[in-house]
């Protein structure tokens, strides 16, 4: 058994191949308690996808985590456009929405960028001043719809993927940037 920190040395190390090859072996609860399963392909690699399981408690704790993080980023005067997937239960977009709802921040799940004209119209129509988006989407929107971006967007939270330093530098010239890696 494990009764001290020293005992932890006897446990085998977990490699990404273990999680990819045998995801259900990492479940410590009955499967009936799993509320969301996320399949992840690690950014920048061609490795095998990994399946991660979440309970209702895990999802709730994630909402709480983001609620606390957003307290430092937005206030009741902000209007946030969530450019993350949000169609399914426990999705990133819905978790962010719940977090912002807890703070009474007006927010909209827009979803991933598909059309820059539509996104720019959405920003203008809804008086959006804050984006939560993936880095590449933000870069595309800020270049193609620069005037709408400059007139409306005060801050951006870049998330869900690696953020290249060059993108941070370019966007910092335009806006306040926050970064966070999430599922």
Model segments located where?
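Conserved S/T- and glycine-rich ATP-binding loop of Class I adenylate-forming
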Residues: 42-45, 80, 131, 156
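AMP-binding/adenylate-forming
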Residues: 56-69, 79-139
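Nucleotide 5′-phosphate-binding alpha/beta core
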Residues: 1-41, 47-61, 68
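Gly/Ser/Thr-rich phosphate-binding loop
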Residues: 153-183
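Phosphate/pyrophosphate-binding betaalpha-module
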Residues: 140-144
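Short helix-loop-beta connector
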Residues: 74-78
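Short, aromatic/basic amphipathic alpha-helical patches
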Residues: 95-100, 146, 167-174
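Short, conserved loop/helix-junction motifs that constitute active-site signature segments
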Residues: 147-152
């Amino acid at each position: 058994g494990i009764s001290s920190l020293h005992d932890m040395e006897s446990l085998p190390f977990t490699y990404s191949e273990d999680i990819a090859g045998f995801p259900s072996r990492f479940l410590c609860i009955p499967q009936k308690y799993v509320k969301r399963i996320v399949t992840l392909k690690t950014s920048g690699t061609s490795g095998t996808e990994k399946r991660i399981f979440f309970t209702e408690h895990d999802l709730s704790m994630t909402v709480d985590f983001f609620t606390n993080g957003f307290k430092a980023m937005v206030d009741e005067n902000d209007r946030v456009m969530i450019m993350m997937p949000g169609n399914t239960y426990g999705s990133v977009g819905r978790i962010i929405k719940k977090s912002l709802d807890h703070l009474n921040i007006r927010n909209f799940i827009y979803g991933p960028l598909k059309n820059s004209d539509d996104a720019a119209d959405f920003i203008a129509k809804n008086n959006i001043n804050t984006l939560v988006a993936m880095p590449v989407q933000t870069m595309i929107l800020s270049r193609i719809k620069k005037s709408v971006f400059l007139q409306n967007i005060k801050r951006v939270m870049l998330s869900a993927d690696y953020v290249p330093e060059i993108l941070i530098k370019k966007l910092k010239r335009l806006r306040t940037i926050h970064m966070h890696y999430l599922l």
